[in-house]
Amino acid sequence: MAASDLESKAKEAFVDDDFELAAELYTQAIDAGPATADLYADRAQAHIKLGNYTEAVADANKAIGLDPTMHKAYYRKGAACIKLEEYQTAKAALELGSSYAPGDSRFTRLLKECDECIAEESSQAPAKNVEAPVAATVEDKEDVANMDNTPPVVEPPSKPKYRHDYYNSATEVVLTIYAKGVPADSVVIDFGDQMLSVSIEVPGEEPYHFQPRLFSKIIPEKCKYQVLSTKVEIRLAKAEQVTWTTLDYSGRPKAIPQKISTPAETAPRPSYPSSKSKKDWDKLEAEVKKEEKEEKLEGDAALNKFFRDIYKDADEDMRRAMDKSFRESNGTVLSTNWKDVGSKTVEASPPDGMELKKWEI
């Protein structure tokens, strides 16, 4: 098979969230030759999705070697280096890449993240020496008389700070918490209808708790997680096929639809325990539903609810048609006729007066 055909199939696999297949097809395309900068840069992105950050950096470097002005190669090198906590290397790559793509907000966002991580590392280093000047004050004879009445200076226990990020697929949100070397039995994760509770309690360390109200509803019984050597990966099964623009409900736009009917709403569920205390998830979800009931949908929200209701009552072919047409057209076409769209690629059709632009990642 020609390299161009393999590259096309690799792109299709990536769009379908089959990142392992995408990486393998890019490898076959590179072996078939010629090995282009685009192939290495795109395989780097597949490696990032798979968590193979060292391989991603290697591929990005090969792409840069073939095309020193390819901004997406620098971007992917920077993104992978951040995951490896190589912040200075990431910053250098992102700064150079942004010079070839001025105005690209993605570089601005990652550079800001880099600066924050570098500042955090810098602030942690001198903190260990804070006790030295405090101890030296004992030598001051004028203060010796007051030492008996001075409470001892106690250094606060170190609190683990785990970074996290997430990405969307059509059916789930994958949340990654970067907690290295955490024993599996120290991790307790509970799922609610629109709630997530993560507790990590390592002996001798301050407990870590992360309990957001989620951007949208999930299906608790389909959610799962895995504790790995460098991270905790949590897969949240979406109850409705919308793109999460943030992880937490507090950051979601007002226009995003809220209400959705699922079998899980009518079936009684037990309260989900956490590692510290028992939480009544049903009570929390009742409060969420009360807020949703009081919300008045209008504009885009009302339209989204209309389409969601169609999807809810549709048969399997109608749902397949809606999913395929919406995904392949970048959200510009929604068809319920599987016979019409099942055997062809649905072309994008932006509204009158608007121009379709591809966003390169």
UniProtKB/Swiss-Prot annotation:
SUPFAM superfamilies xrefs: HSP20-like chaperones (SSF49764), TPR-like (SSF48452)
Presence of the UniProt keyword Zinc in the record: no
Principal place of residence: cytoplasm
Record organism: Zea mays
Localization: Cytoplasm; Nucleus
Annotated ranges, domain SGS: 271-361
Protein name: Protein SGT1 homolog
Keyword Amino-acid biosynthesis: no
Residue ranges annotated for the CS domain, each copy included: 159-248
UniProt family annotation: Belongs to the SGT1 family.
Keywords associated with the record: Cytoplasm, Nucleus, Phosphoprotein, Plant defense, Repeat, TPR repeat
Physiological role: May act as positive regulator of basal defense. May be involved in basal disease resistance to the fungal pathogen Ustilago maydis.
Cellular compartments per GO CC: cytoplasm; nucleus
Stretches with biased composition (Basic and acidic residues): 277-295
GO biological-process terms attached to the record: defense response
Domain of life: Eukaryota
TPR repeats, residue ranges: 3-36, 37-70, 71-104
Modified residues (Phosphothreonine): T150, T262
GO molecular function: protein-folding chaperone binding
A Pfam short name: SGS
Region described as Disordered: spans on this chain: 255-295
